């Protein structure tokens, strides 16, 4: 299953490149954004997305390095892969980072150091260290991220937004992600702190929004693309 996920995401990451390339091929034409925004060239849309994504990757990398500066090891989270995966799965990167902090201090504490299971997917109270090590170990942190994002989309973010889930972290069957009674409070405290003291929120919303609009350009070019004057 995880190998299949890895293949799917690898293909999706390639698809991002193809999306940028195909959008860029619409040279000499203009992109018509939502009402209230100026019409700009398709080339500028591609450039804007690449710049925004790069800024978001840098901001995430800085956030991870700053938070784990106290640790005796570097966080195993790759900022570039994290950003691209969150964009493709359409999951708020602030939620992902908040859970990574609560579950394993961004991968530098607890069993995650040995299992790569940064978000503790499948790890429940009562399981022994041996059970966790043997049954919930991932070959790489990237595979752990994919399993986590897949779980969120299948079981938690089905009919609710990220904020709604973080205030009541139960799945479609009403089962909690964690047994800690203050789990949601911890997540929201970190989330709010990120919104107040970093530019992650602004960069995330702009990057995700522009990516989604680029997809619409390709799916319905007759609505969004016209000849330049």
Language-model regions, residue ranges each:
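Catalytic cores of secreted/periplasmic lytic hydrolases that degrade extracellular macromolecules
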Residues: 2-229
């Amino acid at each position: 299953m995880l190998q299949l996920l890895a293949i799917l995401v690898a293909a999706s990451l390639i698809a991002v490149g193809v999306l940028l390339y195909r959008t860029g091929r619409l040279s000499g034409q203009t992109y018509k954004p939502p009402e209230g925004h100026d019409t700009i060239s398709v080339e500028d849309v591609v450039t804007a997305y690449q710049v925004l994504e790069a800024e978001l990757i840098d901001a995430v990398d800085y956030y991870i390095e700053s938070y784990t500066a106290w640790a005796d090891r570097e966080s195993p989270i790759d900022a570039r892969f994290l950003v691209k995966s969150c964009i493709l799965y359409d999951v708020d990167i602030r939620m992902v980072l908040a859970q990574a902090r609560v579950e394993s201090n961004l991968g530098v504490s607890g069993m995650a150091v040995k299992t790569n299971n940064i978000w503790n997917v499948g790890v429940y109270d009562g399981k022994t260290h041996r059970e966790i090590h043997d049954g919930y170990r991932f070959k790489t942190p990237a595979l752990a991220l994919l399993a986590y994002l897949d779980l969120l989309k299948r079981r938690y973010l089905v009919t609710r937004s990220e904020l709604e889930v973080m205030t009541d972290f139960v799945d479609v069957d009403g089962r909690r992600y964690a047994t800690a009674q203050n789990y949601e409070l911890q997540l929201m405290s970190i989330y709010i702190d990120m919104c107040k003291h970093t530019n992650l929120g602004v960069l995330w919303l702009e990057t995700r929004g522009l990516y989604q609009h680029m997809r619409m350009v390709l799916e319905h070019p007759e609505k969004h693309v016209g000849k330049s004057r």
